[in-house]
Amino acid sequence: MSLRGPMKRSHLRQVSAPSVDDLATSSQAQAQSHPRDGGPYNDEHGQDFQSTLDARNIRLSTTSLERRQVSLWVHDETFSREEILFNQAAFSDLGVGPGDVIEILPVRSPGDSLHSIKSDLGLRALRDSYVETGPALLPDPMSKFKTPLQSRCLFVVKPLPQEIKARHPKLEISVTSSVANIFGFKNRTLVHIDVVDRAQCSASHVDIAFRDQFLVRSDMWRLVMSELAEKIIYKGQKIVFMGSIKATVKNIFIREKKVLSGYFSPHTIPVFRSESAKYVLFIQMSREMWDFDSEGTGDILFSRVINGFLPELFKRWANSEAKHLVTIVLFTRVEYDVSAIGAPLPLSSETLRCISSPNHVPTRDFYRVVVNDMASGHWTAILDELKKDFRTFLRDVSTLKMDCADTPTLDGVKVAPKNKAATIAGRPSTALRGNILEAIHLASAHLAYDHIDRDMVHTGTSIIVITPGSGVFEVSYESLSSTSEALANRGIAIDLVCLSPMPLHSVPLFKYKAPAQRSSSSSFCEFNSSGYSPEMRHSFSFASRTPHLSPKSAAHGSFSRGTAHKEHAASRSDEWNYGIPHWLDISYWNPDTYREARRILKKDLNAPIPFTVTKQSKTFVPRVRMYEIQMMGVMESEQSNISIPYLLEGEGIHRAPSLSLGLSPSALSSTRASYRRNPYKLPLSDSLRPEPFLQGLSNPKDVMLARSKKAPKAVLAWMEQYDDAVFQPFAKRRHQRKPSKPKRLSEPDVQVSGAHERLSARSVLRLREHETNANSSERPYPTRTIPRVAETSLSAPQTPVPSKSASPKKPALKPPSAGKAPRISRTISFALRGLSATPPRALASTEVNVEHASALPTSSPKLLPGPFPDTRSVDSFSGSDSASISTVIDTSLRPASPHKTPQSRAIMPSRPISIKVPPRQPSEDAEPGDRAVIPESYSTTSTAIPFNEHHRRDSHTRTSGPRFEMTVNGGSRDSSIKSPQNKALAPWVRSINPCNTSREVLRDTSWFGRWQHAYPRPPHVAVVKWKSLKSPAILPLTTEEFPTAKELGTDYLQTPYRVFPNDDPEGFEVPKTRGILLREMISLRLSHGFQIVIGKHVAEVSGQHALETLNVFNTASLERNGATIFLSKGNSIHRLVCVDGGEIEVTRFTHRTSSALAAGRRDGFSLYSPAMRTILSPEYELKNIKLDPTAEEYNWNYADNYVAGHRDYLFNPAQQLQFWRVRYVLIPMHLHVNTRRHLQSFNEDNEEEIHLLGINQLTHIWQRHKYIPPEEKRFESSNKKKEQNPLNIMYQTRNPSEVVAAELDRILLSDPGLDSSPAQLLPESELLKRSSISLSSLAHIIQGDKGVRMMDRRWHWRLHYNCFIGFELTTWLLQNFRDIDSREEAVDFGNELMKHGLFQHVEKRHNFRDGNYFYQISSEHRISRPESRGGWFPQKRSDKGVPSTPASNNAKDSPLSGHARSDSLEDGPPHTPATPSKSKNKATIMLSKMMKYDVDPRKRSNRPEVIDLHYDRLHNPDNCFHFELSWMNTTPKLIEDTVLSWAATAEKFGLKLVQVPIAEASAISRTQPFRKPYRVSLKIPPPKGPVPTLFNTASFSQPGFTDMHYYHKAMLRKFDFVLDFEARSAFPADVGVSYSWGTPDYQYPQYIHRSGSTLVQLTDEGDFLFLANRLVSTRAAASREMPRYERMDRAEHLRTRAATHDPLDRLSPRLSPIVRPLHEIGSPQVQSSIDSAHLYRAPELIILGFAEFCNDEGRLEQFYKESHARPVSTKVGPATTTLMDSSIPSLELPASVVSHHLSHPPALVARASVDGSISSIDVRVRARNDSVSYKGSPRSGSLRPLNLS
């Protein structure tokens, strides 16, 4: 591993420190700091570790026993399977007993650090360093673990087996060789052992890595409970759970130090990391990407990506053997200059986006997909693609085509098109103004459908954004809110890698402006139309909408009820707010650092020495800058926008004129003078002021209005006394949570003049208070704040505002409120609780005007906690929690309360006060009545209503504490964010002062939100987070995020219900006890992204002190009565309580405003229209994407009751409860000669029969492992008679739509073979015996009413009269003979009957078999039936005896079928099939069935592992056989193992099992925005298809119309595609067709290539829509483990194939001659050896080959001519088609009749072609007895099973 820097800080989440420390300095500081400083669990574990047991000092024994020196042995598994053997008898004097924890330490020399604390401390920097080093630098594996704490080996004492003790009495202690290698032990070496306390060796965090499997978080929870909890673990330990789930312990942390072993205590936090994840790499191609490197290398910044960072990342993936799937997307935002192009911009107004720039620059976002889901191991190919796309990216996004018709300009006027050449009109924006949030949102969008098409090999999704910027981005409030909420409900990791040097402020930083509300006539462009601020004006957003108020002017002034809202909005748009998101981890790529690391690994003599500080020769290196470049602006840094001017120096800050507020120039001049005289002007500098205080003032100079000269001292004293009473009670709690730095005299914590409160950026406690409480400075003002309403709610004109009555935008402190939590008027605060999804609602709030302002009486400590005393205010402003989403107050909005006279307001000047911590408010403070009157929060752009005397009297009666709590403990737990914006943005972004942020605040664990428990130690920003980039962490199982009790009572809606186990489960796999039910309910929530809430805070809030010490890995403690457990996810909290009576009470807490506000915003901001270019797309295309941040509401009541066994109320639980769903198909392949070698007994079978035999084998497996509840199992064991296969899959050679149209009544309604036994059982008294039955009587019984079903059956184009199926006769014999107990006995008896001449095979080729074989009664035993040849039904339906499947396209396409639309949509007149079932009532039919399948037959799990298996009832062997799996709470790894075993079984019979998407290919863009089908059109339209050949009277379809897609299907057959699924329009309109998993909704028929790698749909217009099946690659990766399930020598197959030229030795899939030969892909025999890169390229090769053929006019004409001259069945699959190569016959014959030599397999690049010779005819088939062959119909039948190529 390379040297990464002085500190190894590879963690998932990262927030930067305020400045960049020197690397060595930071390393030393880390080494010298106390191990528990900043640790996340000091409160929980601190009592377990005495101060003398420092993690960095030598641990001295705390026991009274002496340390014992013993001889250690090393043994292997042949000696014992136990990892450590300990002979207690040898240590009887120590009193060691089973269960004690023993440590093993190597004996070292006296000079070693073991005996020298001083030397150990001296080597601390080296031994305790977190720097990862490579093997060349530190060859000793123990080099990182030198201290005793790190290198000791721990184990739990177990009794020594007696046989070992007897054979080796001198054995003291022995370890396995694997353990010895980890700890560096040698055999027979001396070691020290000692007894240690479990608390001293308890691990705080454990990193657990896994790969090549999909694990849900519930399985992780169960794995920890089963394999790790309360056990000793060691680094490198292999974990096997249920014999299938495999993981490895990577790192163990004790007090922030890596150790080799530790004890997994109840409070240990497991961190699971996936080494087979899906990575989405976004590369921001902003303007700086083409800038030259400022470090002097001369390369452009993109070279850092392509030559530096990405190769390093891929190499680390390869070194760690990670198997990720990589998607790379280039994205940028292009700004267009309309004036430069001299023509109207050819972009419609819907596709343009106006950013906040002064000139309304139109922009468009571009995305270029480079690779999609490509294996990370082929990184060289990835880099090649990236280089190719980089060459043309700038040209493509900058070029604007000007030939669009009726192109609207920016003002909406359409202009006639001008045929003008493409113009370079665009220019990429800077990284600062890029579309990073939209890109992240797009990448996370598909996670909303993560339960569908589940990848069974990869776990986790991580997004890496590579930007040339420095980590600062200007974003809109809506984008930040929407993206943050989308990430809040999805456990996804996001890493930001910056190519520019790290700035001197906190990063990553998002700049956003106030969500100004626009009028109804304004456009979206006007919404963000104000110019960018040239410099940073406001550094804080903790009081983000509080106007900056000068101290002098703040003392005066009055509250007025009216302000100029339009000017307010304009001024607010200039206010910048800054926030650091919790969900983003930032890294800085410095190529020099890793260049030096590589030199160290290569043992370069000039390389720097590790762990040393290299003094820099120069402190500053000047750089040469080009004047032209500087003038272009490309060299400007984002830091120029982060300057911190004092308010007096704001000459460059321009706002709207202030005349609207009645401010005269003289007033402004007096304001300046008063400001100069203000003693507080320096402490109140803008850099430390909590955000804009005077949004109502249009000029920054307005903030300098004098106000506080005459403030009475009595009022100031009262305010101080009031604050002391309000805030003091929480001082104790504050000090318990985190110590505070002493206040600096020169920088007091709070400097408030009137309405303004100043915070010290140096004070961690005060900073966090104000970050949490946006406008906590609002308290001292007794003003009533009216909720702001929507624009349309008030239409009265606004009252003019005199200069003396301008209201302040934000009061500094808020009066206490007893009835309602305060509504802080901070428009947006990315505070500790983070991001929700909503823009601010239109609410009114207090405003302050500092010009001649006078304070209102401060007698009221309440800020509108309940209903307004003035009913006019209530009537006008009352509203629900879901208010309008308008973000700007309309100018028509005016206060409902009448304007009060100056006499009604008492002047109440104030002085600066200190904010104390408020006491916790009792729950009775929250009054339900408040909710109906006051919306959830207050906005900043609002109107203040001053109090009159009545108001003051009313307020005096409410003197309880403040409405929300400001606490010092950071995080979201004790602080409420009451403005709608705060609630919308909590808990995912935190507002800070980016230029002066306390290190303690940054390293507080509350910064990391839901990811808090993923950090073993505080992260650092100066290095690349390789741990996160190499193996992303899965969302931790636990969290400490929890709201306060008041928030829980006032801001959340509670929905309680109870769940109890179903006493009558009707055979379902349901929990039998409450404890099992509770575990399943917790598991279900964990798998849906919930986290278990632990810690002190939730215990205090809930009053359940047991939660503080809750052991989440021991469910026994959770099952007792009264036990409570909380789980949280985003804004949703669930409380599960075990109550009396065996029930579980569930209470759902849902945030009041999140859903309503989110719903409002979705209507206005969810549509996103970027230009996107997918992999094969020739150009960029606009896409309209709905960025919906809110997840669909999940019905937890239904889900819990479903788990409990109450399932009658759900008609489709898989969709209603969002089951995990995957779909598979079995594709018929051509049989390899070696496959036949394993099927010696079936050599006479053709391919089709072998394929059916494979499906039959699968159905036997399914039946054998069908889930049977224990009660039914006991009943079956007593009645062990006759196992019959109930699946009854019916086979036919036509498509399901034809079957439904022709024989609906007989086959699907009247035929009992689908849902019941095919024959009626004889009474018990009439059961037969083999020994007492005669042949003639048996013949009569079989052909009787209670016998076997006899009917005319068609197979391909042959009609077999009066025959039965072997499967049905086997079942009949089993049920009607007393002495036949198994199907094998029935088959043997059937062969005896066949030998005696009772019946015979219709082709006389087979003996009697249990399967889909046709047999006829011999002529001497045949009974004539009145329906001559009609079977049981009238003659018109007599030919329909065999079912078909939904995946066939055989008879439907053939000339013999009159159904025009078989596997494609009809182009002719409407089709009206002669369906016998035609009736007034619409018939319904189910084409699939569902069964419960047990994926854990060996009972490795501690619960039932059952899935729903949906399978086809009708199947055409020429096409795919479908089955779908769905499950709710089953272990996915067991499902994967089951599917792999099925694949191995099917492979033996020439069937390829492939996972395919559930939805059709054309709908892929709905769930995966970076994918799109590739359209291919025919250059020459095909001629009209041939008239289909009709059958005689036995035909089951009437003459149909010409199939307009005849040639299209023939072309698909030529390129080796088979039908997957039919379009829903192919079925008769009068029949309701459905499947057990739902109704068919395919718009177009879908086909799949035999390799499984490509899907294609045929549109109504005759175009082809191609899509790569990326799911097949995951199955290929899984099949590498196939030898576990199939003991088959694949190497032997490869060798045999090379030397054999068997006619049937054809590789699969066969691509067409146009496609580059890709022989091995898809072949079952060589599946494990397929190169995944070739598999990734296979779809592209197939598609390009197909497109080349379709664009070649000559070949198309030749193809049409030959296909029309010799019409064949258009069923997809090489059927009776002629070939281009005459050496390849078009008809695949059985092995027994094919004798001529075929070309060598590698030369076969196409399985089937339409050119070539006429196919051969099997002579044996011609001689079939009792069969009719129709002349003129192509021969197929049993000749051609399923032409597998």
Swiss-Prot record:
What is the recorded membrane topology of this protein?
Peripheral membrane protein
Which biological processes are named by the entry's GO terms? intracellular signal transduction; negative regulation of TORC1 signaling; positive regulation of autophagy
Composition bias, kind Low complexity: at what positions? 801-822, 874-886
The biased composition feature labelled Basic residues covers 1-12, 732-743
Residue segments, region Disordered:
1-48, 547-566, 732-822, 854-982, 1425-1483, 1825-1845
Residue ranges with Basic and acidic residues bias: 34-47, 755-772
Cellular localization per UniProt: Vacuole membrane
UniProt keyword terms in alphabetical order? Membrane, Vacuole
A GO molecular function term, named singly, is: GTPase activator activity
One Pfam family it belongs to: IML1_N_fung
- SUPFAM superfamilies, from UniProt? Winged helix' DNA-binding domain (SSF46785)
> Cross-referenced InterPro entries, in alphabetical order?
DEP_dom, DEPDC5_CTD, IML1, IML1_N, WH-like_DNA-bd_sf, WH_DNA-bd_sf
Q: Locate the compositionally biased regions of type Polar residues.
A: 24-33, 969-982
Q: Where is the DEP domain?
A: 1344-1419
**Which branch of life, at top level?**
Eukaryota
Query: May I have one GO cellular component term?
Result: GATOR1 complex
Q: Which PANTHER family match?
A: DEP DOMAIN CONTAINING PROTEIN 5 (PTHR13179), GATOR COMPLEX PROTEIN DEPDC5 (PTHR13179:SF8)
Q: Which protein family is named in the record?
A: Belongs to the IML1 family.
- The protein's name is Vacuolar membrane-associated protein iml1
Organism the protein comes from:
Aspergillus clavatus (strain ATCC 1007 / CBS 513.65 / DSM 816 / NCTC 3887 / NRRL 1 / QM 1276 / 107)
